[in-house]
Amino acid sequence: MIAWLVALALLYAFFNGLNDSPAIVAPVISTHALGSRQALLLTAAAQAAGPLVLGTAVATTIATRIVRPESMSAQAVLAALVAALLWSVLTWTTGLPTSSSHALVGGLMGAALASAGPRALLLPGFVRVVGALVISPPLGLLIGYLGVWLTLRLARQAKPTLNNRLRRWQRVAMLALGASHGASDAPKAMGVLTLGLVTVGAQQGFGVPVWVLASCLGFFCLGTSIGGWRQMRRLGGQIYRLRPVHGFGALVAGALVVLSAAMLGGPISTSQVMASAILGAGAAERLNKVRWLILRDMLTAWVLTIPATLLLSAGVLEVLRRLQ
């Protein structure tokens, strides 16, 4: 059982990095601040530093604040991972801008409810997590809008060389977002794997073991270094035709929101925050040139992901019980 828990947690970490990396590097690639391979590798390096510098508060949230740990069996944790992983693979192949956080929360809820009923849910923690998931994209949109609006007005008389400076600042903002993303998203896999280890009696407390941190972070960064090229094209040009000012504004907005969530232990969707930040950055210049249909896709993902993974994990748990 431990081998299955480790394998699925690492796969989840890998697809998490694969799904979210386009959101981080798309602005710098589309504005020619960095080449694609260079951007992905630098982002992966920043992500590796994130949990080491900023901590793993999100892991504690995943392991102890959504469902009652004592209500979870090893099979239940396994079912939650299977559901989150299957949903991540499905949405990656279809291009739906979903969230691995939504998927994991839904998976944990479904497995806990199937195991012990409603009493297995920790309502305050659940409300906190869902609140962070819901409020973070609008915050990204608002900060992206305000950042670009302010920059455009301050730079009206600027020389054309301002674009070169903005490209350099974009690289710094990308690294900040990468580190924040590493502290926000990599601990999700660490938290669920730690929960699984506790359920099988492999450890007593919920502190993340060093080998769990290193392995989950390694697979997470590996997924990032490969990147999702289709998502990069969508975020880099299909939402709005980005220039350096938009890329910089969106990256700063994303870094602020994701860093805040990571420090507070709130698991959010970096890809949805960045898509919203790009929408806001574009809207600050030309409202009618923004492709607002991406909001429809995001709302669809919001509505579908938690219910779908909840039902899926409950179904997987029932199958595992029958196979036992």
Question: What kind of region is each of these model predictions?
Answer:
Residues 1-324:
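Multi-pass alpha-helical transmembrane bundle typical of ion/small-solute transporters
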